[in-house]
Structure formats: structure tokens, C-alpha cells
């Protein structure tokens, strides 16, 4: 991306939304400090603006990201809807080192792996951050939608022991098993009634349009095309 591009952010901005991108790491990573404005984000927030954040391993924790989202909501312009796109860092690999600020507390029976223990312990913190957001916005006066998803599965250092427990080898998966390694779960939650569905497969390029539809936000011609 080397210039302005239409995106979910620019579309929501055209509808009057305040648009904020936040990523608790370095602004120059993937040129985010340039790309986010090109995509229609009015404000970009990076690691140096996470004042007082709790660090887990080398990264800002997911609960601190939840705190940031809540503060952005509380400080937003009154009467103007808010769109926040938050890319977390807490669970970034690798998982085979020890840290003074994080002690894994979850293990898997039959697996002796620091990577597995660390990864699942980090996921527990992510669950707590999601719970924190849902608890807060359940009581919010404004209609709110939370979309929660990952960009990829953990590395083979985590997956291999789990696969082995199920009689599979990470480097000898058949085509269908390999496809499963490229799937991630997602959640769309709202503090008001929306159409409910479980185990609905989709692709990331369709997710934005799907969220707009379920949230009751008007969609444009391109988004309608994605939804057909």
C-alpha cells in the first residue's frame, strides 16, 4: 500500500464514524504509521502511547489493550459513533523462552512443552481481555459490536505436540488436515439483538461486510457484492 485505499475504516468514516487504529508495538512495523491514515483512520495509536500498560513477556498485554479501547470509547466525541481497529501483540511467537514478568500457569496433560504451556497461558489472558470488554460494553448505552479473531494459528512448536497427541505429525499432514492449520475462530458479539449463527465459515476478506450486515449498518455496492 503506497497511497489512499478504500477500506472498512474509510467507509465508516464516510458515515460519520470516528476511526481509530491502535497497535501496541512500533509505528514503523509494516509502515503502519503511513498505511493507517491512507486506509481512512483519523487517529493511529502505537506502543509509545500505551501509558502505564502491563507488559507480558516483551509485549503490551491484551488486558491493557482492552483498557485502551474502553478509554477511547469514554473519551470519544459525544454523539459520534466510534470504530476501533486493534491489532494486539501479546501472543506473538516464539514461546520457548522464560520471562521474569510472566509465569505460565496452564499445562496440557501428556505434553511436556514450555511452548504449549506458555501459549495456552497467554490465550487465557486473551480470554480475560475479551471478557473485560464484554462486561464493560454490556452496560454501555450505545449499541456496540465487538469482533474478535486471530490472524493465524500458533507455530509448529505449539501445534506439533498437540497433533502428536491425536496421532498426527506436523510435517506429514494430508491436504484436508493442512487446511485446518489455516483456520482460526472468530466471534461477533453485540450488546443488542443481532442475527445469531454458530460455526459459520467465512474468509477475512468477507468479515467486514458480514459485520456491517449483522450490525445493521448500511452497506455499499461492493460490500453487497461480497455478501452475495
What do these predicted ranges mean?
Residues 1-228:
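Solvent-exposed soluble domains appended to multi-pass membrane proteins
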Amino acid at each position: 500500500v503506497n497511497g489512499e485505499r478504500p477500506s472498512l475504516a474509510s467507509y465508516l468514516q464516510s458515515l460519520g464514524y470516528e476511526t481509530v487504529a491502535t497497535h501496541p508495538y512500533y509505528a514503523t512495523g509494516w509502515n503502519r504509521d503511513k498505511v493507517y491514515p491512507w486506509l481512512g483512520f483519523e487517529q493511529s495509536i502505537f506502543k509509545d502511547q500505551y501509558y502505564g500498560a502491563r507488559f507480558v513477556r516483551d509485549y503490551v498485554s491484551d488486558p491493557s489493550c482492552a483498557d485502551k479501547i474502553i478509554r477511547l470509547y469514554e473519551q470519544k466525541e459525544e454523539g459520534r459513533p466510534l470504530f476501533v481497529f486493534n491489532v494486539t501483540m501479546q501472543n506473538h511467537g516464539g514461546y520457548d523462552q522464560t520471562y521474569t514478568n510472566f509465569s505460565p500457569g496452564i499445562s496440557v496433560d501428556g505434553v511436556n512443552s514450555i511452548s504449549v504451556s506458555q501459549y495456552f497461558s497467554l490465550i487465557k489472558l486473551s480470554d480475560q481481555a475479551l471478557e473485560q470488554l464484554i462486561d464493560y460494553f454490556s452496560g454501555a448505552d450505545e449499541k456496540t459490536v465487538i469482533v474478535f479473531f486471530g490472524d493465524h494459528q500458533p507455530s509448529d512448536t505449539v501445534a506439533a505436540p498437540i497433533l502428536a497427541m491425536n496421532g498426527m505429525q506436523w510435517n506429514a499432514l494430508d491436504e484436508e488436515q493442512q487446511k485446518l492449520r489455516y483456520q482460526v475462530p472468530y466471534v461477533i458479539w453485540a450488546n443488542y439483538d443481532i442475527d445469531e449463527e454458530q460455526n459459520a465459515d467465512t474468509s477475512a476478506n468477507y468479515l467486514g461486510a458480514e459485520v456491517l450486515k449483522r450490525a445493521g449498518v448500511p452497506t455499499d455496492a461492493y460490500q453487497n457484492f461480497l455478501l452475495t
